[in-house]
Amino acid sequence: MARGCLCCLKYAMFLFNLIFWLCGCGLLGVGIWLSVSQGNFATFSPSFPSLSAANLVIAIGTIVMVTGFLGCLGAIKENRCLLLSFFIVLLIILLAELILIILFFVYMDKVNENAKKDLKEGLLLYNSENNVGLKNAWNIIQAEMHCCGVTDYRDWFLVLGENTVPDRCCMENSQGCGQNNTTLLWRTGCYEKVKQWFADNKHVLGTVGMCLLITQILGMAFSMTLFQHIHRTGKKYDA
C-alpha cells in the first residue's frame, strides 16, 4: 500500500513539474520575444536599467524552468541528489520571497519615495531612440489606467515642454491632443493608480500568493518524502 502511494506520488510529482517546466519555457520565450521586439520594455527606472519587464520575465522563466527540470528528473529517476537540489532551490526561493515581503513592509515609505523619484527620472528617457519599449509601456499604462505622469500630468512638462503631455494622457486620444492642453487630461498620476489597482485586487493577489506558497511547500514535502524513501531502501522501487 505504502509502495503504491509512493509510486503515485512519484508520477504526480513528475507530471506537476513537467507542467511547471513547460510554463517556464513559455515565460522564457515570451521574455525573449519582448526583449527582441520591444527592447527595454517597461524599463521605468534609470537606476536599474536591466530591471525591465522583458528581463524579469526571462529571469522568472529561467528559474521556473530549472526548478521544474530538477523536480521532473529527480522524481522519474529517483535521484536523491536531484531531489535534494529541488528541495534546496524551493527553500531558497521561499526564504527570498519572505525576506523581500518583510523588507517591503518595513521600508514601505522609503520604497515609495525612491520609486517615485526613479520613475520621474525615467520619464527623461521617454523620447530617447533606444527606449522605444519604455515609451510603449508608458503609453499603454496611461491609456489603460486613465492616468498621466508619475504623480500628476505636470511631470511631463520637464520632458516634453510646458503644457505638453503625451497624447495618451488625453481623455479623448487624438494626434497632437497633448500639446498646449491642460484641461481634457487624466489628472491623476499613474503611481497612485497602480497602487489603487493593487489595493482593489488585494484579495485576488493574496489568494494567488497563498496558492503559490502552498504549492512550494507541497513540492518541498513531496520531494523530501521521496528522498527519505530512496535513502531508507537504498534502491529504486518498481513503478
Swiss-Prot record:
The chain crosses the membrane at residues 14-34, 56-76, 86-106, 204-224. Glycosylated. It holds the Pfam family Tetraspanin. Keywords: Glycoprotein, Membrane, Transmembrane, Transmembrane helix. InterPro entries: Tetraspanin/Peripherin (IPR018499), Tetraspanin_animals (IPR000301), Tetraspanin_CS (IPR018503), Tetraspanin_EC2_sf (IPR008952). One of its GO terms (cellular component) is plasma membrane. Glycans are attached at residues 180-181. It is a multi-pass membrane protein. It is found in: Membrane. Belongs to the tetraspanin (TM4SF) family. Found in a complex with GP6. This is Tetraspanin-9. It comes from Ovis aries. The lineage of its organism: Eukaryota, Metazoa, Chordata, Craniata, Vertebrata.
